[in-house]
Amino acid sequence: MYLDAAEKQEIFGKYGKSNSDTGSTEAQIALFSYRISHLTEHMKLNRKDYSTERALTMLVAKRRRLLNYLKDKDITRYRSIVKELGLRK
């Protein structure tokens, strides 16, 4: 698998409150961003993989919903996570 438990713990430790903080919005957004970048690379090689294309679209939408939630709740945390991850907005 492209993402093992140690890599997940590293992502959660960097963007969450602790290594076991899997529920914070920032940690979830960071994990989705990692998965989106991996699937984007896969789609560059396999253009006709429509199930992966659908999964990628769903992940982007889920990340967008989390970003909208964070923007409504705490704009400073939203701006910091967008800047750290290098997202467009």
From Swiss-Prot:
Keywords: Ribonucleoprotein, Ribosomal protein, RNA-binding, rRNA-binding. GO terms for cellular component: cytosolic small ribosomal subunit. InterPro entries: Ribosomal_uS15, Ribosomal_uS15_bac-type, uS15_NS1_RNA-bd_sf. Pfam families: Ribosomal_S15 (PF00312). It comes from the Bacteria. GO terms for molecular function: rRNA binding; structural constituent of ribosome. GO terms for biological process: translation. SUPFAM superfamilies: S15/NS1 RNA-binding domain. NCBIfam families: S15_bact. Belongs to the universal ribosomal protein uS15 family. Part of the 30S ribosomal subunit. Forms a bridge to the 50S subunit in the 70S ribosome, contacting the 23S rRNA. One of the primary rRNA binding proteins, it binds directly to 16S rRNA where it helps nucleate assembly of the platform of the 30S subunit by binding and bridging several RNA helices of the 16S rRNA. This is Small ribosomal subunit protein uS15. It comes from Bacteroides thetaiotaomicron (strain ATCC 29148 / DSM 2079 / JCM 5827 / CCUG 10774 / NCTC 10582 / VPI-5482 / E50). The gene is rpsO.
